[in-house]
Amino acid sequence: MAIHITGAPCCWGVDDVKNPYLPKWQTVLEEAGKAGFRAIELGPYGYLPLDIDLVSAELSKNGISIVAGTIFDDLVAAGNCENLLRQVDDICDIITKLPPLPREEGQRRRTPYLTVMDWGHDERDYAAGHSDRAPRLSDEDWGRMMEHIRAIAEKAAKWGVRAVIHPHAGGYIEFADEIDRLAEDIPDEVAGLCLDTGHLRYSGMDPVEWLRKYADRLDYIHFKDINEKVYNEVLAEHIRFFEGCGKGAMCPIGTGM
């Protein structure tokens, strides 16, 4: 089976949509097309507009398709479920109306995917990469997060979209014990996995080992690299995950660990 490399707005530093210094979304699509990418992620909720005609025209102009949408939000809080499900509908509504990528022989699920990440907890953000000191969820809170993930995946499936769970440094699904528990609690028929080589390494795991371990659950992979010198310096500080990235902990692929 062929493996295709696509892009994501995070390669342009697009993380928090409230950041006033983000590049224009049109610039990202234009530069992605010039770089030779044939597909890109939608980016964080609210970065690309939800105007299907506008986005479709810009994608077509640059020869790009959308490979995935993203939910990057608090998956734990009891009061956030309605917001999460609204995002599912908004994202799936646009990505299912855009031209799809062709399905490869042997591909487990067709694109576009809905990448789902937990985020928004200071106590875990400052403990990113530190499994020994990062607080874990109570069984009750973990169970609620799993309920939210199942609800997200089920709603996405009604749109014909496959949800894939992305363990993320600084969230409550980051470390080895949490990934294993997630894989046990959320079966493959409900949602797939999107493992990220940079986040795995940042969180103390061997990416190759974990990609092999969950090869039969993987629908999608994120490739990143880590600057070992900066990474070690960042871990020695009391610092948020994206502050560490801002210092250069994540680096161009092939130049790091």
Q: Which residues does each predicted region cover?
A:
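Active-site mouth loops of central-metabolism enzymes
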Residues: 10-24, 76-85, 134-143, 254-255
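Catalytic domains of carbohydrate-active enzymes, especially glycoside hydrolases
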Residues: 24-48, 98
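Acidic/histidine-rich catalytic cores of soluble enzymes
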Residues: 39-40, 142-252
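Short, flexible, mixed-charge acidic loops at enzyme active sites
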Residues: 19-23, 123-130, 231-243
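Active-site acidic/histidine proton-transfer and metal-coordination neighborhood
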Residues: 61, 65, 80-193
